[in-house]
């Protein structure tokens, strides 16, 4: 039979664990409220964009006219594609990062190139010779300028003929 001292220590340990768990619950509840608020703030924008796109798409010509919409065919038949790889900055996204990297490595050929956004993707692909550029932007404050920074290299490589498609 356990001594009363051991029982008291065990009870205190359980109470401490309960306090920590409660604090974690409060923090996660606060973060969830903040995420829901952010979602509600951007929802009208995305709804409007979806509605606008759904009105415009039926009026587009059958054949896209801009060269960015065409995948160039190479004489050897093996196009050089660029993949914009979006991963998290930390490994706290469940299996998301692993699934993205697994799909990338299944789809990519030896001639393809990777533009990686996120620290997890960079750490996984940093020794891969197909890595062209990595972007260490945090996801906390996305901006139009960051989006331009990310796409300018891929667009320039496409225009110069180094790439035949961007995915």
What are these regions (language model features)?
Residues 2-167:
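Conserved loop-to-helix interface motifs that mediate assembly, gating, or partner/ligand docking
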